[in-house]
Each structure stands twice: as C-alpha cells, then as structure tokens.
Amino acid sequence: MKYSTVFTALTALFAQASATAIPAVRSPLAPRQSTTASCANSATSRSCWGEYSIDTNWYDVTPNTGVTREYWLSVENSTITPDGYTRSAMTFNGTVPGPAITADWGDNLIIHVTNNLQHNGTSIHWHGIRQLGSLEYDGVPGVTQCPIAPGDTLTYKFQATQYGTTWYHSHFSLQYADGLFGPLIINGPATADYDEDVGAIFLQDWAHKSVFEIWDSARQGAPPALENTLMNGTNIYDCSASTDANCVGGGKKFELTFVEGTKYRLRLINVGIDSHFEFAIDNHTLTVIANDLVPIVPYTTDTLLIGIGQRYDVIVEANAAADNYWIRGNWGTTCSSNSEAANATGILRYDSSSTVDPTSVGVTPRGTCADEPVASLVPHLALDVGGYSLVDEQVSFAFTNYFTWTINSSSLLLDWSSPTTLKIFNNETIFPTDYNVVALNQTDANEEWVVYVIEDLTGFGIWHPIHLHGHDFYVVAQETDVFSATKSPANFNLVNPPRRDVAALPGNGYLAIAFKLDNPGSWLLHCHIAWHASEGLAMQFVESQSSIAIGMSDTDIFEDTCANWNAYTPTELFAEDDSGI
C-alpha cells in the first residue's frame, strides 16, 4: 500500500418587514414509511425502517420511496426581537430559525428559494448533504453556483441519501450569522429507542446589530464579543437599565416540557458565529446516538461538546424528580467571548403550568474547545479507510492591512460571477490562485482514498471547526502536537474511525481526515467560525474533474442563475468585501 496524504498547514495573514423570532415548537416527527413493510419504525423498534434498518450501508443503498417533498423559502429583510432587543435581520419566511424542512430517507426534495432581499444576492447550502448526482445544488456562491439575484428564484433539487439531523443556511458571505438558517431533518432508523422526537434545538451567539455592521471591526483582528446567545431563536436580555430605544424587553427562555417516564430525542445544532457550547440538562443524562449525519454506538455523558456546524442527536429520559431544571448551553469561555455567556440557558419543566426559574445546579463543565473524544464517536456502521494518496503542501504568512487566514499561503477569494463549477462546465482547466483549488484524481486503482492533513502553525492556539462539503469524512487523527509527514501516518486510525462532516482542528495541532474519491464535484472545505470563513480560511477540492460536467443534470438552470446575477451586478449596491463564503 502506498501511503500518501494531502497536507496543508494553517497560518494567519494580516491584510489591512417585521417578524418576531419564535422558538421551534415540538414536532413529533412521526415515521411515514408504510406500516405493511417488514419492520416498522416505532418507539420500541427505532432500528427498523421498512425493508431497511440501522445496519443498511446508506453510502451504497438508498430507499426508492417515490416521494417528492416540495418547499418554498423566501429570503427576506425582517425586523425581529428574539431576546427583547429589536434589530434588523435576514430571515427565511420571516422567522429565525427558518421553517423546518423534513423528509424521509430516500425522498426527493424540491425547494424553491426566492431572494426577496433588497440589496444582496444569496445562496443556500444544505449542510452535510453529499449531493450525489446533484453537485450543482450544494449552494456555495463562487464554487457551485452564482448567487441568486434579488427578485430571482432558484429551485434546489436533491435526494435524501442520508438520514438524521442537519440544517440549511445561506453561504453568501456572513448572511447565516444574521439569521438565515433553519432545520433540515431526514427521518430514518436510529441506534436506540425513544418515545418522542422533540426536533431541532439550535444553539448560537447573537449580535444586537447586523454582523455586516461589525465586519469592518472584526477583520482587524480579534472579533468582538457579541451581546447575547439564543436557544432555538429566543432568550432574555436585561433591558431594565437601558436607555436604548431598541431594548424593549419581553424576551423569553426556550422551554421544554417532559412527561415522567418518557424518552425524548433532541437534535442539537450549533449554528453560532464564534461559539463553542457544552450542552447539558441538570440532573439528566444524555445518551448520544448520532454525530452529524452518522449514527453511532450509543454512549452516555453529562455534558456534550458541540462545535459550530456540528450536530448531535441525544436521548434524554424524563426520570428526574418532577421539578424545573436548567438546560445549559455552557458557553466555552476559553474559546471565545460573549457578553452574556452565563445566559446561554433554557428551561426544562415537568409541569407546563410552572413559571418559576429552576434552582437546579449543573455539573462542572469540561471547559475545553475540543470535540467529543474520538473514542466515544464509534460509527454503528463499521467502515475502514482503504489505500490512500499523498500530496504535501506547505504554507506561509504575512502581515498587511487587515487580518486574513491562509491555507497554502493563499487566502480564499472567490468571484461570485465565475464559480468553479461553471469554469469546469466551460472546459476551463486553470483556476485563479486565490480560489485555493486542490485537484483530486484517482491515478492508481489501489488508491481510492485521500487523506487530507491540515496543521495549525499560527501559534494562536485557536481551535477551528473544519467542515467539508460533498462527503462524510473519517477522522483518522486529531492531535495537539506537530505533524510529521514521515512518522505521524503510522498512527492514523484507519479502522472504523469517527465519521462526520465537521471536526475540530486543534490549536497548534493537526487534523487528518480521509474520504473516498466517489463524488465528483467542486467541494468547499472551510472553518465554520463565520469570521474566519469570511477572512479566507477555506479551500476547495476539485474531485475527479473530468466527470464533473457530465454529472450535471440541470445545466440550463445553473446557467440562467449566473445570467440573472450578471444582469443584476451593474446595479449592485454592496460589493463583495470578504472571501465570498
């Protein structure tokens, strides 16, 4: 076996309508498959899914449900008051979070997205969805599409070949940090039984002005501490001593109500700008059954570390004394700052009529910026890494007028009007240097895999949540020491390592991820700290380039979106002033 690795080190470069936010309500996601199937999914048989089960290899097999689920999303400028402070925001259909998109494993999704913003393009990414056979719908401006121009509509179409918990969000600059996100839940089997599905619970930090107003300050170096946190789009901010007319009060805590003896499935999602949470519910144990879109062997914990973009599905049994309990976000104060870090809380009640605050005491948080231990994240479907290939790429850093991050000595800077996939469709083979393209092509029949190593050489000690589009990846190493191209690969875990689509790059360490070259496309890899992505901490893999154009099915729609964007840009009020993502 020839061992090779894609190696990248990380350095830093300094280069000078009205709607009220509402928390997502409980939505018991009842199984929708036929009850005449061989194995019905129920509270006592969650591993079943008709003719399929939790043991089915979903990378190779997708149910043919014959069902198409259609949704309409309007991207809007709105005025919202999620925590008692009124501010402008960007919303899907007027709310933060946006409406839930749900489907069953194997369903086809058709989602019409209309851009009703006055002065911005947009695009929607379906986080964690591999987009097999639908690469042009990954939703990244400058990579897989041109932005959707104001007044234009783009219809995204893809099949749900995976199942579990994820989210959709704008990938146009910093828009998701201004409210453009919502839950995407694909029903399927699970590794443990439960009675009720609570649905998505979002954790995030929240500013009291648009992040675009903060951007000029943020890119000068250390990002500012934001004013508050939200849990499922709501929280309380103390306006009692404020003279600010926008501080109107009236916020509320996110609440859950449990019935004693019932087991609940919670779908936890960190959609923060610059936040790391350690979720917990006082006096309750979390049974973790999935990370990102990968079912895992269940394990129990008192607290759960959740990086930006990551999702965990947990089961919580209502077995405590009937009382009120704090639901704790547990802000990672050693990872980033927030003015109301201690306020990242919600309330669990056993009596829905109760209105008093809990007096419960939580466990001591671990207080780390890391992921959950890799030893805990064991995929239920056991898969190994095969023969892989190597590319070594070094980096450098420089200082100019403002802060940017670099990968391979280059900070990502995309041209929204000329996405990578369009260049490939037009038979272009040379890409701009600041597109940060790494070509991946299988040249040896025994090397179907690539291992990509990203190493933090900045000395800052910041942990970065790294997200790859187009693939679940295998976490073969996640270390706080220095990577050695000659020695470190010998310690890679190639036997059923954790699989997911977001994993933390340790500060001053390295992250090694493996994935199979089985999905031709232009796939973005980036830090999911919003400031860092805008500051260029990203690159893209052009995988199996010769197969990309022939894999595109809706080329007319793809080209029409670019034509409409190019017709709009001469009147564009706000020019691109970040990486584009």
Curated annotation (Swiss-Prot):
Disulfide feature: 146-562
Entry EC no(s): 1.10.3.2
Predominant subcellular localization, coarse grouping: secreted
One GO MF term: hydroquinone:oxygen oxidoreductase activity
Residue positions binding Cu cation 3: 171, 469, 526
Domain spans labelled Plastocyanin-like: 74-191, 197-353, 413-547
Keywords associated with the record: Copper, Disulfide bond, Glycoprotein, Lignin degradation, Metal-binding, Oxidoreductase, Repeat, Secreted, Signal
Membrane-spanning parts: none
Cofactor(s) for this UniProt protein: Cu cation
Entry's Gene Ontology BP terms: lignin catabolic process
Positions with a binding annotation for Cu cation 4: 464, 527, 532
Protein name: Laccase-2
Species the sequence originates in: Botryotinia fuckeliana
Lineage, broadest ranks: Eukaryota, Fungi, Dikarya, Ascomycota, Pezizomycotina
Gene: lcc2
